[in-house]
């Protein structure tokens, strides 16, 4: 496999499992907005990963103004209770430590709001392994590809020597838009088929698999 000097990571579903806190936040927001046909808890997992603005407009027919209100309701819950209702996947710390030891430049590129992402990285002490932490911020840095560009530019990354590691099709699609390879991981919220259909360069089933590909 080609050598990568800069390793970009997604957060939700890749480094940490945020499912319980996020799903509780989704349910809170939908109830506040009067939405009753949002499905069961398992079906709400599909909202983990992408930018909620476009997804909720497409799924529920929210107007741009209404989706902003819905996301504000979601954040009422999530910013107090949901963000720390989270856990690091097994093997992640060891993987990051080995990548750092190998001299890789490591950055975060998440569609989660940057201030929340920074709190999560600090809470779990994952920030110590990273050279730069990038997240969504405003209309000009909302989509995955925009955040990835931001994080890669921050460390002066050559796109040919960079790779994004993520668990959803949005990661593979965002990486492709930036001209960057993508390692799709199956321990998160996307399937191998979803990742392959979206154009992931290769698939890893465990953090140990990622290490074997990168070192």
Predicted regions span which residues?
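Glycine-rich phosphate-binding loop signature in dinucleotide/nucleotide-binding domains
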Residues: 1-2, 101-104, 154-159
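Conserved Lys-Pro-Asp/Glu-containing loop-to-beta segment of HAD-superfamily phosphomonoesterases
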Residues: 6, 144-173
């Amino acid at each position: 496999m080609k050598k990568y000097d800069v390793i970009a990571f997604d957060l939700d579903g890749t480094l940490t499992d945020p499912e319980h806190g996020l799903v509780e936040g989704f349910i809170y927001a939908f109830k506040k907005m009067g939405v009753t046909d949002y499905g069961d808890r398992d079906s709400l997992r599909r909202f983990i990963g992408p930018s909620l603005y476009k997804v909720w407009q497409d799924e529920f027919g929210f107007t741009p103004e209404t989706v902003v209100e819905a996301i504000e309701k979601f954040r009422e819950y999530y910013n107090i209770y949901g963000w720390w209702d989270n856990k690091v996947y097994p093997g992640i710390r060891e993987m990051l430590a080995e990548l750092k030891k190998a001299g890789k430049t490591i950055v975060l590129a998440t569609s989660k709001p940057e201030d929340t992402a920074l709190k999560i990285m600090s809470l779990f002490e994952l920030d110590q392994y990273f050279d730069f932490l990038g997240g969504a911020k405003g209309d000009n840095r909302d989509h995955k590809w925009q955040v990835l560009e931001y994080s890669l530019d921050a460390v002066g990354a050559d796109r040919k020597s960079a790779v994004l590691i993520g668990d959803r099709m949005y990661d593979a699609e965002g990486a492709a838009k930036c001209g960057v390879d993508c390692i799709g991981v199956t321990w998160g919220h996307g399937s191998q088929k979803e990742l392959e259909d979206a154009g992931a360069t290769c698939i890893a089933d465990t953090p140990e698999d990622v290490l074997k590909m990168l070192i």
